[in-house]
């Protein structure tokens, strides 16, 4: 049962967390290198 439910939990988790981390790192990178 756990092995059957694991992908259904991991797929949305990876699908939501990975883009969030990518967007946050990109945002911080842009903020750090922004020239005023």
Curated annotation (Swiss-Prot):
Q: What is its main location?
A: plastid
The annotated topology with respect to the bilayer is: Single-pass membrane protein
Q: Which GO terms describe its biological process?
A: photosynthesis
**Similarity comment:** Belongs to the PsaI family.
Q: Which organism is it from?
A: Vitis vinifera
Functional summary from the UniProt entry:
May help in the organization of the PsaL subunit.
Q: Which residues form a coiled coil?
A: none
State whether keyword Plastid applies: yes
Q: Give the CC-aspect GO terms.
A: chloroplast thylakoid membrane; photosystem I
Q: Where are the transmembrane segments?
A: 8-28
Keywords tagged on the record: Chloroplast, Membrane, Photosynthesis, Photosystem I, Plastid, Thylakoid, Transmembrane, Transmembrane helix
Q: Which domain of life is it from?
A: Eukaryota
Q: Cellular location of this protein?
A: Plastid, Chloroplast thylakoid membrane
Query: What InterPro entries does the entry give?
Result: PSI_PsaI (IPR001302), PSI_PsaI_sf (IPR036357)
Q: What is this protein called?
A: Photosystem I reaction center subunit VIII
């Amino acid at each position: 049962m756990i092995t059957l439910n694991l992908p259904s939990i991991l797929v949305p988790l990876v699908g939501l967390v990975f883009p969030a981390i990518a967007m946050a790192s990109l945002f911080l990178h842009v903020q750090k290198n922004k020239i005023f």
